[in-house]
Design a protein with these regions (language model features):
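Conserved N-terminal glycine/acidic-rich loop preference
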Residues: 1-8, 37, 50, 59-64, ...
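Core AdoMet radical
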Residues: 1-10, 24-52, 98
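Hydrophobic faces of well-ordered beta-strands that scaffold small-molecule active sites
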Residues: 1-3, 26-30, 66-70, 95-99, ...
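Active-site glycine- and acidic-residue-rich loops that bind
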Residues: 7-11, 45-48, 74-86, 120-128
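Catalytic cores of alpha/beta
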Residues: 12-18, 75-91, 131-132, 154-156
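Acidic (Asp/Glu)-rich catalytic clusters
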Residues: 16-25, 57-61
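Conserved strand-turn element in the central/C-terminal portion of the radical SAM core barrel
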Residues: 37, 59-81, 101-106, 113-121, ...
Length: 173
């Protein structure tokens, strides 16, 4: 099974429950998003990078497989920030990673910022360039479980290319 949560929602009781449920393979997916505390505050994540590190270590110590989620194109971040996040995530020793482009869903604070011109999502070629810079930094022992966000068509405001998964894979080739 795979269970996803935020680092600040994880405690010893939940880890013990997952570790003790008797399944052969349990993945804990943690929404790390970035290693930058200023960005985590800006996007109202409710946790710090240190809390994320502690959650990863605790989950690994409990014997769980851990997959971290990172986002490219967060408000106020650039490619260097994203790559710093990739390096940071790799250093934590997780077995899996999911990389996501930020997209703008309807009815959110990010949608308001985008509509007012205060946020610009990554262009497709910018995201592909970031992936091309990030993927070689990730050891072959780390399972890449995703390389693009998966928005529902009815919720997506921008960017339109976020619905074209095959296009990103083609661009990477």
């Amino acid at each position: 099974i795979a269970v996803g949560t935020r680092p600040d929602c994880l405690d010893g009781e939940k880890l013990a429950l997952l570790a003790g449920c008797g399944l052969d393979e349990i993945w804990l997916e943690l929404g790390l998003q970035t290693c930058r505390d200023d960005t985590l505050r800006r996007i109202n994540r409710g946790h710090t990078a240190r809390q994320a590190e502690e959650a990863v270590r605790a989950a690994l110590d409990a014997g769980l497989l851990v997959c971290g989620h990172l986002m490219a194109g967060l408000p106020g971040e650039d490619e260097d920030d994203f790559l710093d996040g990739v390096d940071w995530a790799v250093s934590l020793g997780m077995q899996g990673l999911k990389l996501h482009n930020v997209y703008v869903p309807q009815g959110t604070e990010l949608a308001r910022q985008w509509q007012e011109g205060g946020y610009r999502p990554l262009a497709r070629d910018e995201y592909v360039d970031m992936l091309c810079a990030a993927l070689p930094r990730i050891p072959s022992t780390v399972v890449m479980q995703r390389i693009q966000a998966d928005p529902a068509p009815g919720e997506l405001l921008a960017p339109a290319w976020a619905l074209e998964k095959r296009g990103i894979i083609t661009d990477l080739r």
